[in-house]
Amino acid sequence: IAPYLLPRFLPEFSRKYPQIDLQISEMKTADVKRALLKGEIDAAIVAQLSELEEFNADTLFFEQYFVYASPSSELHDRDSIRTADLREVPLWLLDEGHCFRDQLVSFCHLKSARRSQRSYHLGSIETFMRMVESGLGATFIPELSTFQLSEEQKRLVRPFAVPVPTREIVLLTAQDFVRESMRRLLVDEIRAAVPPSMHRLTHAQKSI
């Protein structure tokens, strides 16, 4: 989330509220939960999951997934991608424990893909995108990342067929968090930093 949301949100927030000193760290979801429960962080921006019910969650926006396919991939020739289309192509996937990866693997039924399918595990969406651009396989990218792409890169983007897998991005706080005005400010400013079209889940999207 951070590489694509922070450039849209942080500069304007810092300009409007220079007195607020935000300390930002990137963590996996399991580490976020521990840090919130221990009071080590005040809030977290994560993809909503059923296992986060012990926290307060404010919806920030809904972000759909896209396929990023190299010109040599059979996916590149499709106008939209069905989940069944993904089971015979090499995919670049984040390691287990990243909610971005885990939600898509579940939605697309990739765990049932043939054992002979080549899949690659590294740690960065940006790295995967460079590999796709070099002609190798396909990967998944979040909607906010598409606003940073060049025209050449946009030609590698393919939408999912309906229902489009979409993640709900939320602001998490502990149940005993008392700084209500700060929480509300963060929610409002983050929502203002993303396109209005992402504020609601559409009928063509499916929250995963």
Where are each of the predicted segments found?
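Central regulatory/effector-binding core of bacterial HTH transcription factors
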Residues: 1-53, 114, 121-122
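N-terminal hydrophobic or amphipathic helices and topogenic motifs
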Residues: 1-4, 8-11, 15-19, 184, ...
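Conserved functional loop/turn residues at catalytic and ligand-binding sites
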Residues: 5, 21, 35, 39-40, ...
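A late-sequence structural motif
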Residues: 5, 91, 156-200
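General small-molecule cofactor/ligand-binding pocket signal
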Residues: 23-25, 58, 119, 158
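Beta-alpha-beta core module
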Residues: 52-59, 63-64, 78-79, 85, ...
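Thr-Gly-centered strand-to-loop micro-motif
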Residues: 70, 94-95, 118, 141-142
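Secondary-structure junction motif
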Residues: 76, 90-111, 179-181, 187-188, ...
